C-alpha cells in the first residue's frame, strides 16, 4: 500500500511533461556505468589499456578531468547516483557490514550500514518512467533486490549482488544471469548478452524516449581473461586478464553506440559514461593519484566521466570543473525537461550549464561521509601510494574538497589532513600545521555540513580494540 501511495503521488506530480531544453523532441538518455574502472584505466588518460569506443565518446563530447564518485565503493556510489542524494540521506555507506576488518584493530563501533536504499527513496528511473520514458536496466544493480521495483520496465541481470555471480561467461551456474543460458551458446560473455539485449530494446523503442542504464559488472573481480583480447597484453607490463576485460567492456559499449548510429538515434541521445569508484589498487595502479577503490584519497574517488550530446556539447572539449556522480540525477531531469524545483532535496546540480556554456554553474564544495571500516587488501608495493595502513582501505571519517584544498577528518583520533591538490595531487604532504587558518575554516564547514545532513558520527569505543 505504501508503495502504491508513493507511485500515485509521483505520477500526480510528474503528470505534466515539460518540453526538452530546446523545445523539441525529448532526448533519450544512455547512462553507462562501469564497475571499479579507475581514472587511469581508459586509453584517453593512459596508454596501458585500449578503449577506442570510450575514446570515441571523448572525441565527440566533453571530458571532465576532475570528476568524482560520490563514494569509494560500489553500493554507496550507485545509491547516490540513482537517488541524487549523499550517503547520510539514504544510509548506504559501504558494501555489506560496516565493521569489516579485524575487530581488534577497530577503535570505534561503526555506524550500522543499510545494504539497500529505503523503499520510499525514489530513483531517477522512477521519475523518468512516470514522465513517459521507457526504461531498461542492464547489469549490476546492487541497491535493492530488483530494479523493476525502482522504476525500470525491463531488467537484464540486475539484483542486489555486488559481484558477477556465476562468472562472466555462460553457462551461468547461479545468479540472475542463469535464465539466459538457453538463449546464448556456451562461452558467451556477459558484455555480449547485455549488448544484444540493449540492441533489441533500442529497436523496439526507437520511437519512444528511453532511459537506458547500462551498468556493467566489468571490471569487478573475479578477473577472467577474455580470449579474444588477452594475448595482445601479455608482456606489456599490465595485468593482461584485467586489460582484456576492459577492452571487452569497451567493445560492448561500441555495439550500443553503433546501434544508435544505425537507428538514427545518435543526435537525440544524451550519453554519460562513468565508473562507480576508483580502480582496485592491487590490480591497476592509479598513480599519480593515491590509493584506489575503498579509499577517499584521490585514487579511490577520481573517476572518468565523459558526456556526449550532439549539437549541444562541443566535440573533444575538456572541462576541469570538479563534478560528482551526484550531479547526474539533476542533469538527467534537466535534459528531459522535468522541473526539479519541487523534487526531493538533491545534493548535486545540473551539468547542463557546463556542457552547453549557457547559464551559471554555482561554485560549491564536495563532501564525502563514511562512518565505517573497510578492510585493506594487504601490503602495497609502494606504501606512500596506498592508504594509511595495510589493515584498512579507510577508517571512519569525512572528507571535503574546497577549491584546491582537500581536508580529511578521521573520527578515531580526530586527525586532520589538509592537501593542496594543485601542488600535490598524490596527497603526500599534510599542510595542517603550516596552514592552521585554512584548516580551521574548512574543518568548521565540514562539521556544519555534517550537522545539516544529520550525518551520524561513531563515538562508542569498541571493547575488542587492542592498540598496537
What are these regions (language model features)?
Residues 2, 7, 18-417, 423-451, ...:
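Formylglycine-dependent sulfatase
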Amino acid at each position: 500500500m505504501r508503495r502504491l501511495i508513493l507511485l500515485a503521488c509521483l505520477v500526480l506530480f510528474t503528470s505534466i511533461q515539460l518540453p526538452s531544453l530546446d523545445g523539441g523532441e525529448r532526448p533519450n538518455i544512455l547512462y553507462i556505468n562501469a564497475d571499479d574502472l579507475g581514472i587511469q584505466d581508459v586509453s584517453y588518460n593512459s596508454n596501458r589499456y585500449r578503449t577506442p569506443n570510450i575514446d570515441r565518446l571523448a572525441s565527440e563530447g566533453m571530458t571532465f578531468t576532475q570528476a568524482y564518485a560520490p563514494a569509494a565503493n560500489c553500493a554507496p556510489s550507485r545509491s547516490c547516483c540513482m537517488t541524487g542524494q549523499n550517503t547520510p540521506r539514504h544510509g548506504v555507506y559501504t558494501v555489506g557490514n560496516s565493521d569489516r576488518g579485524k575487530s581488534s584493530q577497530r577503535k570505534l563501533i561503526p555506524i550500522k550500514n543499510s545494504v539497500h536504499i529505503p523503499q520510499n527513496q525514489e530513483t531517477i528511473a522512477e521519475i523518468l518512467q512516470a514522465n513517459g520514458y521507457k526504461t531498461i536496466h542492464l547489469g549490476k544493480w546492487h541497491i535493492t533486490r530488483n530494479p523493476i521495483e525502482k522504476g525500470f520496465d525491463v531488467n537484464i541481470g540486475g539484483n542486489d549482488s555486488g559481484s558477477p555471480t556465476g562468472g562472466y561467461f555462460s553457462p551461468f551456474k547461479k545468479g540472475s544471469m542463469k535464465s539466459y543460458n538457453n538463449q546464448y551458446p556456451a562461452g558467451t560473455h556477459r558484455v555480449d548478452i547485455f549488448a544484444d539485449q540493449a540492441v533489441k530494446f533500442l529497436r523496439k523503442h526507437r520511437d519512444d524516449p528511453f532511459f537506458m542504464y547500462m551498468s556493467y559488472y566489468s571490471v569487478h573481480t573475479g578477473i577472467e581473461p577474455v580470449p579474444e583480447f588477452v594475448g595482445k597484453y601479455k608482456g606489456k607490463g599490465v595485468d593482461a586478464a584485467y586489460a582484456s576485460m576492459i577492452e571487452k567492456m569497451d567493445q560492448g559499449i561500441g555495439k550500443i553506440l553503433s546501434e544508435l548510429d544505425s537507428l538514427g538515434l545518435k543526435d537525440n541521445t544524451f550519453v554519460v559514461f562513468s565508473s562507480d569508484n576508483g580502480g582496485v589498487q592491487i590490480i591497476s595502479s592509479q598513480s599519480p593519484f593515491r590509493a584506489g577503490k575503498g579509499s577517499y584519497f584521490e585514487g579511490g574517488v577520481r573517476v572518468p566521466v565523459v558526456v556526449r550530446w550532439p549539437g549541444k556539447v562541443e566535440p573533444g572539449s575538456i572541462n576541469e570543473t570538479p563534478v560528482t556522480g551526484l550531479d547526474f540525477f539533476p542533469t538527467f531531469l534537466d535534459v528531459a525537461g522535468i522541473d526539479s524545483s519541487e523534487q526531493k532535496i538533491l545534493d548535486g546540480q545540473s551539468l547542463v550549464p557546463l556542457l552547453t556554456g549557457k547559464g551559471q554553474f554555482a561554485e560549491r564544495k564536495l563532501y564525502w561521509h563514511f562512518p565505517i571500516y573497510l578492510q585493506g587488501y594487504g601490503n602495497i608495493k609502494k606504501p606512500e601510494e596506498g592508504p594509511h595502513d595495510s589493515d584498512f582501505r579507510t577508517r571512519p571519517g569525512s572528507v571535503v574538497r574546497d577549491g584546491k584544498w582537500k581536508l580529511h577528518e578521521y573520527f578515531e583520533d580526530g586527525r586532520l589532513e589538509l592537501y593542496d591538490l594543485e601542488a600535490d595531487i598524490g596527497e603526500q604532504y599534510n599542510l595542517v600545521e603550516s596552514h592552521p587558518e585554512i584548516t580551521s575554516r574548512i574543518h568548521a564547514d565540514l562539521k556544519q555540513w555534517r550537522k545539516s545532513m544529520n550525518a551520524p558520527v561513531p563515538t562508542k569505543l569498541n571493547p575488542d580494540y587492542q592498540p598496537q
